[in-house]
Amino acid sequence: MQREEKQLEASLDALLSQVADLKNSLGSFIYKLENEYDRLTWPSVLDSFALLSGQLNTLNKVLKHEKTPLFRNQVIIPLVLSPDRDEDLMRQTEGRVPVFSHEVVPDHLRTKPDPEVEEQEKQLTTDAARIGADAAQKQIQSLNKMCSNLLEKISKEERESESGGLRPNKQTFNPADTNALVAAVAFGKGLSNWRPSGSSGPSQPGQPGAGTVLAGASGLQQVQMAGAPNQQQPVLSGVQMAQAGQPGKMPSGIKTNIKSASMHPYQRPCFPDSSLAISPGYVTRPPGRDRPHLQLWR
Amino acid sequence: MEAPPVTMMPVTGGTINMMEYLLQGSVLDHSLESLIHRLRGLCDNMEPETFVDHEMVFLLKGQQASPFVLRARRSLDRAGAPWHLRYLGQPEMGDKNRHALVRNCVDIATSENLTDFLMEMGFRMDHEFVARGHLFRKGIMKIVVYKIFRILVPGNTDNTEALSLSYLVELSVVAPAGQDMVSDDMRNFAEQLKPLVHLEKIDPKRLM
């Protein structure tokens, strides 16, 4: 007896605390709905519902707990009904039940649902019994199948949309193009290479090989220039240009060591081996200035 | 003859050796808009600047193995702008931690008779192209996004065709020699452009 009483008390306490929590969250939800309805967002409402559902779950767990005695077996009998205000009751119920009287008791100590609700429930049970076990089973199965189909569709949709977002929709750069462009800028690969060899027209674009010239760097591939077919190329060597950082300093400090000219009959007049100042008088038009490729610069 | 490496040159007054730090990448045509938007957000606030340049690369072949290269550039859409002559040295190798390609760089503005001058000096034009694109700045960093057009008829800059379906993206800084923290800043900026563009140090010698 003692044990059962203790168990009863303990479970009652647990139940009380759970119910109090539930009441609080319900209260806050109602407050939210009433006062902040214009700012309310669906996720926030969902949160409140989730909270309520969680609390109901714990309540259920408490009731199902093995240490909980069957409350069904307990009966609550009002001992005294009085129409007077009861301060104690007021305090305990937080002002909701001021009087423990004839009107209050049937509502609060109810164990059966309303008569109308009871009628409806009875009707539903008779309907269900009428259908028959097999038909009922079939209906249950079809309901389950439809629910699972729907769930599958939803999850598939969710998965697809997620993966669509993660997949990089398109490549934004092409490494081969990068290399081609860098090569074009660095040493003219793929651009029309001008060979001052007297032959007409630009060389075929993209033709590497003898025509390919490499951006100035030592140790790179040497351009083969045969002596004879390349006219009017005096061999200049050792051009050193001063490091001029600002405009205007360019002409200063240019020293050219001009060695002997090429063997070709069309050659410039020989210059003395000395520092050469660029003066108007020096410039003689080298023959072949009217060569087609040079007409560009007219 | 190639200029000796910068580190060997004595510092004898006057000019400072400027180095160009370079990172390159490319972007496909259809992603150009997104890249431009991102650059407009990241870079200094200025009017979007487009340019059309015609660049010619001149070679001076000597008795030595490697020719001397000069690059002449002129603007096709800005009348009256000076021509620009540039020398770019060999990329300085060795430091694997350096995140950008570093090479000696000499820039100068010239008058319009540059090509005549170079021809007289004995340079010959090796190749030319037209570059059309956008220019952005962030501090000392310059970001250029441009398309290279091949010139079909020499000398005729109207008759061009695109070299590829991509735009070349270059992030460059011209700074005095020895300032390697610049390359760290460049790498941080390049990180912000991923995954649209991968800016990296591309060694031209690898692409011969």
UniProtKB/Swiss-Prot annotation, chain B:
GO MF assignments: transcription coregulator activity
InterPro entries xrefs: Mediator_Med18 (IPR019095)
GO cellular component assignments: core mediator complex; mediator complex
Stretches of the chain forming a coiled coil according to its record: none
Annotated positions of the Phosphoserine modification: 66
Entry's Gene Ontology BP terms: positive regulation of transcription initiation by RNA polymerase II
Sorted UniProt keywords: Activator, Nucleus, Phosphoprotein, Transcription, Transcription regulation
Location within or outside the cell: Nucleus
Pfam families: Med18
Subunit-level organization: Component of the Mediator complex, which is composed of MED1, MED4, MED6, MED7, MED8, MED9, MED10, MED11, MED12, MED13, MED13L, MED14, MED15, MED16, MED17, MED18, MED19, MED20, MED21, MED22, MED23, MED24, MED25, MED26, MED27, MED29, MED30, MED31, CCNC, CDK8 and CDC2L6/CDK11. The MED12, MED13, CCNC and CDK8 subunits form a distinct module termed the CDK8 module. Mediator containing the CDK8 module is less active than Mediator lacking this module in supporting transcriptional activation.
Family: Belongs to the Mediator complex subunit 18 family.
Role played: Component of the Mediator complex, a coactivator involved in the regulated transcription of nearly all RNA polymerase II-dependent genes. Mediator functions as a bridge to convey information from gene-specific regulatory proteins to the basal RNA polymerase II transcription machinery. Mediator is recruited to promoters by direct interactions with regulatory proteins and serves as a scaffold for the assembly of a functional preinitiation complex with RNA polymerase II and the general transcription factors.
Name of the protein this chain belongs to: Mediator of RNA polymerase II transcription subunit 18
Organism annotation: Bos taurus (Bovine)
